[in-house]
């Protein structure tokens, strides 16, 4: 039984990284990896996390295409006292605190992915710098890495 995604057996203290090509297959690969290594609290928690992950990877791929970046996107999983999944890309990023850069029209074709991801994983973090962007998706309250 998972109680609030807290580890009862102590931290597992391991991590790994998967490089994902800028291809739609990367979304399926990432989702499969997470499903295989994570025990979710419920089917709804799994669905919510996977929707957020899909949006984050899709945004990273869009940014790489827009900026003509050939390097892969990185999916990292850290398993310690709190389990975290991270997606890193080499794009310019998006300032989640700058409301003026978000589209005003909810029917706009882009700009909603990270907001949707945050709706499903409220503790999501975004760090952008001149060398890229990393989005962290904590599993707290959703599941644990096995």
Spans of features found by a protein language model:
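Conserved ATP-binding N-box helix of the HATPase_c
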Residues: 44-71
